């Protein structure tokens, strides 16, 4: 979902 969390 988030590019920083990779989900």
Curated annotation (Swiss-Prot):
| Chief localisation class | secreted
GO terms (BP aspect) = neuropeptide signaling pathway
Q: Which UniProt keywords apply?
A: Amidation, Neuropeptide, Secreted
Recorded superkingdom = Eukaryota
Q: Does the keyword Protein biosynthesis apply?
A: no
Q: Which GO terms describe its cellular component?
A: extracellular region
UniProt subcellular location: Secreted
Q: In which tissues is it expressed?
A: Kidney, skin, mantle and the hemolymph.
Instruction: Tell me yes or no: is Secreted among this UniProt entry's keywords.
Output: yes
Residues with the Phenylalanine amide modification = 7
Q: According to the UniProt record, which cysteines are disulfide-bonded?
A: none
Q: What does this protein do?
A: Appears to be involved in osmoregulation by affecting the kidney, mantle and skin.
Q: Which family does it belong to?
A: Belongs to the FARP (FMRFamide related peptide) family.
Task: Please state what the protein is called.
Answer: FMRFamide-like neuropeptide GDPFLRF-amide
């Amino acid at each position: 979902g988030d590019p920083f969390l990779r989900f």
